[in-house]
């Protein structure tokens, strides 16, 4: 579903529904809006907004998903790519593939992101180890990791804010 059920409201940033919508419609519209906020060329200036968009995109998956937010030298979005899908409590992430995608998109920096289907965004030791492994691999090709964000129903945790980068 696209935004065809929405009409612009009288106030900027508001919308009016022109037909009934389901909860699934609303969630899908929220995901489309979050994706548009992470569209190519947009500068990322507010970390909390970025976390909110990432949470909207990933929090409802029933399996773990690992993704990359690819950025240029001015930290403008090049793209958002879901790279790996796993099980309820893990996903296999291959550093070679992460580096390959970063190079294919000529990314100067990336934000790593994955969800915890349990809803608890607290990073595991495996998450911290993966961050270090990917940081080393990406540094070798001149790509900086700005953050690794873990998403859950209960919120987002930034490994950068925790000093784990």
Regions found by a protein language model. Name each.
Residues 2-27, 32, 52, 74, ...:
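Active-site-proximal loop/helix of nucleotide/amide-processing enzymes and allied scaffolds
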Residues 23-82:
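Long amphipathic N-terminal alpha/beta scaffold segment
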């Amino acid at each position: 579903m696209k935004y065809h059920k929405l009409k612009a409201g009288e106030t900027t940033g508001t919308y009016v529904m022109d037909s009934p919508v389901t909860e699934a419609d609303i969630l899908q519209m929220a995901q489309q809006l979050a994706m548009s906020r992470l569209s190519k060329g947009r500068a990322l200036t507010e970390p909390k907004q970025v976390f909110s968009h990432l949470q909207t995109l990933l929090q409802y998956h029933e399996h773990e998903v690992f993704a990359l937010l690819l950025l240029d030298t001015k930290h403008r979005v090049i793209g958002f790519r879901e790279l790996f899908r796993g099980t309820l409590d893990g996903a296999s992430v291959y550093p070679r593939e992460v580096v390959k995608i970063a190079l294919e998109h000529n990314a100067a920096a990336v934000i790593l992101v994955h969800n915890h289907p349990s809803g608890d965004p607290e990073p595991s030791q495996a998450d911290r180890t993966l961050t270090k492994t990917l940081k080393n691999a990406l540094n070798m090709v001149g790509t900086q990791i700005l953050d690794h964000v873990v998403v859950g129903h209960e919120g987002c945790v930034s490994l950068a804010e925790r000093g784990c980068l």
